[in-house]
Amino acid sequence: YSKTSPKEKQKRGERALKMAYCYERSLQTQKAIASYKNAIRYEVAIPQNRLSYARLLLKNGEYKNAISEFQLVLDSLPGNKLALAGLESARNAPDIKQLGSRYTVKKMDVFNSRRSEYSPVLFGDQFDQLYFSSTRNEAEGDELSGITGTKPADIFVSQKDDKGKWSKPEQVQGGLNTAFDEGACTFSPDGREMYLTQCQSDASFPRYATIVKSARSDASWGKASEMKITNDTLTAYAHPAISPDGEWLYFVSDMTGGKGALDIWRVRFTTAGMGGVENLGSPINTEGDEMFPTFRPNGDFYFSSNGHPGMGGLDIFIAKVGADRKYHLEHP
């Protein structure tokens, strides 16, 4: 872009648009915003590009600018659900922000390293074990990711003692972790099985995220085996969650038939194996992305979404089953 003459407006605008897409995908929000501005200035941005720009403005807390952009998008794409949700979000966000939160968030240094830690889940009868994913140096494998520059993630665990102090996290032993990415684990209600996401790589053909299962023997987790949810090998299956009754596997996928790019689906465990997959549909899934499904023991269903009205980007939502046995969405 910087080496393209300003006189070549079309080419400069097209390159700005490609930069915006790359920055957006790599979560570099401010750089993506700047690149979208350039693409708009050179008049190469279509309404869908301006929708992406508006959603980034919302994510960045630029609510007034976001409102203007969402309104422009709706002039071209009347009724667009993501634009309508974004406009509602941008109008309500300042008041929600001013109200504050009843939760206090603080960093837990005992779990963190200089690398990435994510997807924590409590385990055990007393919830005194914390499993999470980390790309710290102790992870398996020698190769670094071409995307993150770090090692692939592994599952680590920390134990809380009688005094409430958490131990230094250790890599889960027993063959669970591999040289590939392991992350976002969950457990069966009886604690005997772990379900997690594994992302293998192969230079000869594309590989997609899969859900794998590990069985526990005493205190050790064994080598994981792949869960065959469908016969489609060109679809990603990730972020597993087991329903409190142990009958359903909830997961995230980009498979065809969804409402957005990423939806939450579920499949039932039967005596004959896995049943047919079901899309959760409304009010859970939107034209945006829904990810990271999680259950409380009482059945409350938590997930992340960037398609429902919120504060911008991925927000946390809760859904509860009503008397009609359907999910009802509550405020984030």
Over which residues does each language-model region extend?
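Short, conserved micro-motifs composed of acidic
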Residues: 25, 52, 59, 63-64, ...
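Amphipathic alpha-helical repeat scaffolds of TPR domains
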Residues: 11-18
